[in-house]
Amino acid sequence: MTYPTNLEIIGGQGGSSFSFTGENNGASLEKIWVWVGGWQIKAVRAWLSDGRDETFGVPSGSHQEYVFTPGECFTSLSLWGNGAGTRLGAIKFKTNKGGEFFAHMTSWGLKTEYPMDVGSGYCLGIVGRGGSDIDCMGFMFLNAVQSTVLTNVNYPTINQLIPKVATEEIKSVSFENKTSVKQEQKVETSKKVIKTSSWSMTKSFSSTFSVEVSAGIPEIAEVSTGFSISFGVESTHSLEQTDEKNETLTTTVEVPPKKKVDVHITIGRASFDLPYTGTVKITCKNGSVLQYETKGQYKGVAYTDIKVNTVEKDL
């Protein structure tokens, strides 16, 4: 049986069990404080990227601190027991940003070092047992990752959304027909449009993994009653995506005899800022999958089709 996470615990069997991880929401270890005693690790306080923090053991005296930056992962981790099989004795790790941390008991010497498998290096939090001290503890890691996809994306408030569309004139031209025969005039125009889409995600996660999004993107269309919102077909996008293209239009305008026709060519631009819900599916290289529900904010810019308006007047 393969698992998406890796956890090895070092120390004794006393105390009460604790588990403080982002296993259910992808949150990672953001900051850690460690208090040490003569023959044990006294206490640990951990912060996760979802805003939670907890303290285990009983702090005493000064502490050592390590703060992780977004995208900072473990490259190595070693743990020691206290040599008597009753407590955690030391924590030592290095990161991909050149960071180093070493907290150890102060009176008893270190004996057996236990190097840990850090997997992808992305630390989901800590698990162990504690009471007045840290009896035992380990760090939970996400195993090496093959792919990360945001899927099952929904926009719960989209049906309540009243589209705000800014209409931009691309071209304005007039044709006069002073003859007694109907004339046809060709009109051509083009407009460079930049469509954008982004789905918010915690900085620690999006800085570490390349996330694909499998989703339909909100689109805007002009209808007889104004504007309506629809979804494009579900396809694969990056977490932040920009699509640049030239929208072109070629049309023929009929100008009746003794008439003037004013032609106005416009396009509508809509900005979206709305909540989304979805599922993050992390597939590890060992074939296992970690999946959890998530939510965030979608921001995007979409355009309507180019529209041609004509106004006919007598000469």
Swiss-Prot record:
InterPro entries, A to Z: Aerolysin-like_pore-former (IPR053280), Jacalin-like_lectin_dom (IPR001229), Jacalin-like_lectin_dom_sf (IPR036404)
Domain Jacalin-type lectin: 4-143
This protein's name: Aerolysin-like protein
Organism: Danio rerio (Zebrafish)
Gene it is expressed from: aep1
Oligomeric and partner information: Homodimer in soluble form. Forms an octameric pore-like structure in the membrane.
Single GO term (MF): disaccharide binding
Notes on the domains: The jacalin-type lectin domain has strong affinity for high-mannose glycans with terminal non-reducing ends of Man(alpha-1,2)Man or Man(alpha-1,3)Man.
Lyase found in the keyword field: no
Expression induction: Up-regulated in the presence of organophosphate pesticides and zinc.
Chief place where the protein resides: membrane
Effect of S190A: Fails to homodimerize but can form higher-order oligomers
Keywords: Cell membrane, Lectin, Membrane
GO CC annotation: plasma membrane; pore complex
Compartments it resides in: Cell membrane
Effect of substituting D135A: Abolishes carbohydrate binding. Fails to homodimerize but can form higher-order oligomers
